[in-house]
């Protein structure tokens, strides 16, 4: 039996005229900055549409879980500002994230990660994280997960330690 997941392309991407180059990180950052500056191009229009679609999904989630707070729910501008602030890098693993992606369930896609999962996707209650970290964090606290993701264990060479003792 083959347990490897089949890589599925996103169907609606076929309608886009997006080059492989436009999926690259540097171009995704430029695209976010262009959106922030009000530049309208074919690629920014697609990105705006995709961001709004994802925000609508978070709104739907909050309504289902009875967490929706109309006065505090995140906005398009709050998401764009957060993308610029974090330079489109995951809060936890610092991976470069994608706004546009062509593979379903792309683990490097941006996602909204709630600081307090008992609250909705509200301004002041979210960071941006890659989908991989967002799914792995589950119900752990934001700070504990951040600590485990950015923890660097330094292993000393025991031979160097022995040489120092001999001196």
Regions found by a protein language model. Name each.
Residues 95-128:
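Histidine-centered nuclease catalytic patch
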Residues 1-19, 66-67, 121, 153, ...:
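Structured catalytic/translocation cores of nucleotide/phosphate-coupled proteins
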Residues 115-127, 135-167:
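Polybasic, low-complexity binding patches
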Residues 91-94, 132:
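Short, cysteine/histidine-rich loop/knuckle motifs that typically chelate Zn2+
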Residues 1-61, 78:
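Mixed-charge, low-complexity interaction segments
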Residues 45-92, 118:
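Short, charged surface segments at domain edges that flank catalytic/cofactor-binding sites
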């Amino acid at each position: 039996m083959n347990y490897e997941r089949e890589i599925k392309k996103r169907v609606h991407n076929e309608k886009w005229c997006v080059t492989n180059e436009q999926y690259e990180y540097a171009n995704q950052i430029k695209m976010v900055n262009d959106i922030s500056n009000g530049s309208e191009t074919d690629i920014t229009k697609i990105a705006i549409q995709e961001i709004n679609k994802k925000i609508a999904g978070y709104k739907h989630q909050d309504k289902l879980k009875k967490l929706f707070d109309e006065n505090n729910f995140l906005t398009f501008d709050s998401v764009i500002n957060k993308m610029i602030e974090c330079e489109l890098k995951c809060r936890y693993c610092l991976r470069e994230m994608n706004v546009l992606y062509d593979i379903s369930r792309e683990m490097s896609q941006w996602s909204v990660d709630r600081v307090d999962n008992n609250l909705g996707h509200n301004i002041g209650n979210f960071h941006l994280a890659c989908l991989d970290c967002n799914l792995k964090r589950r119900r752990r606290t934001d700070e504990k997960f951040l600590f485990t993701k950015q923890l660097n264990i330094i292993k000393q060479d025991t031979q160097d330690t022995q040489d120092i003792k001999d001196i």
